[in-house]
């Protein structure tokens, strides 16, 4: 009998996380190997968490407020979607998780990773991914993808934030040395999808996921 598995896709803005998940979803809409699939994202995944997402995307706020809202959305996400799906022995694939809070609120917004960890301590409820896949790309490639999105405000912020991009990218790359964390070159969309499928298959065929 399968154990439920929690998989997270992380990386800098423009690395291709959403495109990777959408590509995988087209190939495997409901099932992969012997697992039923649940796709989700952060912030979001539940009705309330999606409402918090809209606040985060559309309102200007203090970094600390932002961190608490991300944690609030994560609490809902874990308790109402991730944990129940894992208990049903499903494979959950999430576009971002708590590592994004460490990178963006902790480092980019400069409130500190330790502070973000404290804020998320109760939100996480010991729920961490079994496997994390880091999509990496350089600033030039990420910028081209952001330009294609057509949001001038986001693009202006992205261009001004080259140093932030480097900080966040360095943090994500530092995670690759951790257990069950894998690096995927995000420069080529087709190649990164193939690599993800290869790595995920290998991970799920391990005798144990823990």
From Swiss-Prot:
EC annotation from Swiss-Prot or TrEMBL: 2.7.4.9
Keywords noted in UniProt: ATP-binding, Kinase, Nucleotide biosynthesis, Nucleotide-binding, Transferase
Q: Which CDD domains match?
A: TMPK (cd01672)
Molecular function GO labels? ATP binding; dTMP kinase activity
Pfam families on file: Thymidylate_kin (PF02223)
Report the domain of life of the source organism.
Bacteria
Reaction(s) this enzyme catalyzes, per UniProt:
dTMP + ATP = dTDP + ADP
Q: Name one GO biological process term.
A: dTTP biosynthetic process
| Cellular component terms per the entry's GO annotation | cytoplasm; cytosol
Q: Fetch the InterPro entries from UniProt.
A: P-loop_NTPase (IPR027417), Thymidylate_kin-like_dom (IPR039430), Thymidylate_kin_CS (IPR018095), Thymidylate_kinase (IPR018094)
**Binding residues for ATP, per the UniProt record?**
11-18
Function recorded in the entry: Phosphorylation of dTMP to form dTDP in both de novo and salvage pathways of dTTP synthesis.
Which protein family is named in the record?
Answer: Belongs to the thymidylate kinase family.
* Identification of the protein by name: Thymidylate kinase
Q: Which gene encodes it?
A: tmk
């Amino acid at each position: 009998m399968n154990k439920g598995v929690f998989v997270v896709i992380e990386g800098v803005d423009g690395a291709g996380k959403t495109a990777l998940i959408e590509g995988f979803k087209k190939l495997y809409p409901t099932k992969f190997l012997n697992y039923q699939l649940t796709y989700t994202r952060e912030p979001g995944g539940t009705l309330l968490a999606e409402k918090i997402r809209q606040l985060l995307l559309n309102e200007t706020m203090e970094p600390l407020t932002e961190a608490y809202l991300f944690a609030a959305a994560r609490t809902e996400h874990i308790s109402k979607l991730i944990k129940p799906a894992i208990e049903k022995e499903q494979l959950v694939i999430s576009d971002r998780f708590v590592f994004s809070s460490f990178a963006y609120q902790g480092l980019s917004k400069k409130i500190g990773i330790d502070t973000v960890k404290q804020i998320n301590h109760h939100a996480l409820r010991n729920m961490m991914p079994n496997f994390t896949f880091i999509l990496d790309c350089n600033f030039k490639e990420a910028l081209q993808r952001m330009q294609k999105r057509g949001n001038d405000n986001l693009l202006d912020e992205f261009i001004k934030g080259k140093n932030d991009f480097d900080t966040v990218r360095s943090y994500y790359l530092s995670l690759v040395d951790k257990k069950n964390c894998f690096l995927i070159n995000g420069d080529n969309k087709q190649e990164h999808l193939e690599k993800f499928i290869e790595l995920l298959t290998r991970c799920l065929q391990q005798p144990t996921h823990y």
